[in-house]
């Protein structure tokens, strides 16, 4: 009987520093990798002035992946936030923490090797579960075995319960509360550049996917922290309609059981305001941390 790979039967595992984490992701999981084609002109035997295009495939583009997790009160998902924000300085330079990602279905086990998270977004909608959506790139995607493949790493025990966070949203701009909040988002973008990895010598020996050239190393460029804050336009705040600032301090936090849960303390932001016309008028602060932060792990805590 033919076995299919079904998303609803899939499980997602992170392997980092010898530890394995089984993630409870939302259904929005995706991953892929494409190969680069090099086309060239080829003359025909009967007419040397006529050309057709030949092709050569010797290298792969970086693989892509994305998934989302609920940030629960037990904080079993803290590894995802750490991989998004924290540096790996073990080699004497500031790089992102890398990891391997395994997706296990009822038929296959897929591996994304050398993953780095390039973007993460915290969805802080008022009265909704707190969700972290991440996407990134990896060196190589492969099928490493069937569903019974033995995953590496020591499994980190998860909590026996999972409690979603229906958070109370609290936002301050220059130490002043932003009233009448509707929603907010917080985004981290890690801009990376893969080091050129194609060589003529290696390209001549490529015969299949098994010996094709794959990305190996990258450099980390700038890091951007940004987001938006949407509030209802009322008599309490209409006097600040259509404003901007180039040096403001923005604090975004969620409160769970009267305690701070997620906290982003951003010093030195620019923001602009824009209006939104709907049944209830709103205005949105679009903000960005002006400087590339030295240590995001201490600026955004969870």
Where are these regions (language model features)?
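Signature of extracytoplasmic/envelope-associated structural regions
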Residues: 1-302
């Amino acid at each position: 009987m033919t076995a299919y790979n079904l998303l609803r039967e899939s499980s997602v595992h992170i392997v980092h520093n010898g530890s394995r984490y089984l993630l409870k992701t939302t259904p929005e999981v995706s991953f892929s990798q494409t190969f680069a084609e090099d086309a060239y002109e080829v003359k025909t035997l009967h007419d040397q002035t006529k050309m057709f295009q030949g092709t050569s495939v010797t290298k792969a583009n970086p693989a892509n992946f994305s998934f989302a997790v609920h940030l629960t009160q037990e904080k079993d998902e803290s590894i995802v936030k750490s991989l998004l924000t924290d540096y790996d300085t073990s080699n004497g330079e500031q790089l992102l923490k890398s990891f391997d990602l395994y997706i296990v279905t009822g038929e296959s086990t897929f591996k994304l090797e050398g993953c780095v998270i390039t973007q993460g977004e915290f969805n802080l909608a008022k009265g909704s579960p707190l969700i972290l959506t991440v996407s990134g790139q990896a060196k190589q995607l492969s099928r490493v075995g069937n569903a019974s493949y033995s995953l590496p790493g020591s499994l980190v025990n998860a909590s026996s319960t999972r409690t979603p966070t229906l958070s109370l949203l609290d936002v301050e701009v220059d130490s002043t509360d932003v009233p009448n909040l509707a929603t907010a988002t917080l985004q981290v973008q890690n801009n990376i550049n893969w080091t050129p990895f194609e060589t003529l010598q290696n390209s001549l020996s490529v015969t299949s996917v098994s010996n094709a050239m794959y990305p190996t190393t990258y450099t980390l460029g700038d890091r951007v922290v940004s987001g938006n804050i949407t509030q209802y336009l009322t008599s309490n705040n209409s006097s600040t309609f259509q404003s901007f600032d180039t040096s403001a301090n923005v604090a975004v936090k969620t409160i769970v059981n009267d305690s701070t849960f997620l906290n982003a303390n951003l010093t030195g932001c620019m923001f602009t305001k824009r209006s939104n016309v709907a049944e209830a008028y709103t205005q949105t602060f679009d903000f960005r941390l002006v400087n590339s932060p030295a240590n995001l792990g201490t600026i955004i805590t969870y």
